[in-house]
């Protein structure tokens, strides 16, 4: 067997000029080896095993509990409900948060290990909902207590909306890097609300209508329009004079 000296010299020259040349990957190797980065591998492991903390204070939690059933099956996302904050990395606040419950919520959040995420579910959690106008104990937004990553509006939101929020949270986790987490202990792109500019209005249920004349006696215009004479026993002194 005689080798071509010209081709051999070209190969040696190519090795000297480009010693780190790209090696040829065989077909079998390309089908059995996955190339990735440490960030992608780490984020894939975290987004595939989000463990939510069971925390519900009102009717919104019933919709979250529906995810545990076979119809929605949120186990396919790797979600495993936990009862201890030390084993959870996601807290889904579902329901009204009161002033008395606020310190307990903050304590649960602080006991969760980093990195941790928060989802605010329902109108009562986000803004106070139906209790935002006249309640003296409801917190007007859970983002006044802890930072929130995602909001799920609704009263209450359907389980499909919760699944959509989980998918968006998984996308957020997949875009994080280890360098950002090592430089900053606090997570970025989280939301704290500002003070609400609420106006004080006169209460509606004051009880003053009980003392009005029309409460016991219909007005004269109404009786004339309906053609129903009022019995004399029900007439007041002023109405008797007018009659």
Curated annotation (Swiss-Prot):
Residues binding [4Fe-4S] cluster, per UniProt: 59-60, 124, 155
GO molecular function: 4 iron, 4 sulfur cluster binding; iron ion binding; NADH dehydrogenase (ubiquinone) activity; quinone binding
Keyword Transmembrane helix among record annotations: no
Pfam families for this protein: Oxidored_q6
GO cellular component annotations of the record: plasma membrane-derived thylakoid membrane; respiratory chain complex I
Location in the cell: Cellular thylakoid membrane
Co-factor binding comment: Binds 1 [4Fe-4S] cluster.
SUPFAM superfamilies the UniProt entry points to: HydA/Nqo6-like
UniProt cofactor(s): [4Fe-4S] cluster
Keywords: 4Fe-4S, Iron, Iron-sulfur, Membrane, Metal-binding, NAD, NADP, Plastoquinone, Quinone, Thylakoid, Translocase, Transport
InterPro entries given in the database record: NADH_UbQ_OxRdtase-like_20kDa, NADH_UQ_OxRdtase_20Kd_su
Stated role: NDH-1 shuttles electrons from an unknown electron donor, via FMN and iron-sulfur (Fe-S) centers, to quinones in the respiratory and/or the photosynthetic chain. The immediate electron acceptor for the enzyme in this species is believed to be plastoquinone. Couples the redox reaction to proton translocation, and thus conserves the redox energy in a proton gradient. Cyanobacterial NDH-1 also plays a role in inorganic carbon-concentration.
PANTHER family: NADH DEHYDROGENASE (PTHR11995), NADH DEHYDROGENASE [UBIQUINONE] IRON-SULFUR PROTEIN 7, MITOCHONDRIAL (PTHR11995:SF14)
Protein name: NAD(P)H-quinone oxidoreductase subunit K
Organism, scientific name: Picosynechococcus sp. (strain ATCC 27264 / PCC 7002 / PR-6) (Agmenellum quadruplicatum)
């Amino acid at each position: 067997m005689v080798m071509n000296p010209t081709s051999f010299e070209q190969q040696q020259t190519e090795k000297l000029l480009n010693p780190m040349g790209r090696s040829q990957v065989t077909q079998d190797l390309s089908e059995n080896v996955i190339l990735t980065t440490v960030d992608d591998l780490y984020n894939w492991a975290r987004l595939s095993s989000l463990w939510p903390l069971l925390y519900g204070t009102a009717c919104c939690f019933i919709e979250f509990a529906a995810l545990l059933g076979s119809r929605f099956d949120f186990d396919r996302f790797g979600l495993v409900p936990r009862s201890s904050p030390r084993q959870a990395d996601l807290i889904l606040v579902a329901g009204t948060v009161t002033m008395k419950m606020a310190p307990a919520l903050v304590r649960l959040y602080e006991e969760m290990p980093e990195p941790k995420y928060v989802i605010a579910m329902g109108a009562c959690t986000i803004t106070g909902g139906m209790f935002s106008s006249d309640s003296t104990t409801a917190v007007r937004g859970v983002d006044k207590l802890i930072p929130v990553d995602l909001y799920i509006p609704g009263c209450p939101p359907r389980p499909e909306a919760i699944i959509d929020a989980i998918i968006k949270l998984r996308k957020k986790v997949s875009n994080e890097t280890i360098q950002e987490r090592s430089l900053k202990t606090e997570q970025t792109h989280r939301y704290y609300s500002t003070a609400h500019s609420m106006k004080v209005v006169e209460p509606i249920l004051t009880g003053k209508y009980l003392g009005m004349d029309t409460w016991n006696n219909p007005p004269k215009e109404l009786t004339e329009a309906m053609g129903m004479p009022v019995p004399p026993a029900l007439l007041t002194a002023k109405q008797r004079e007018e009659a």
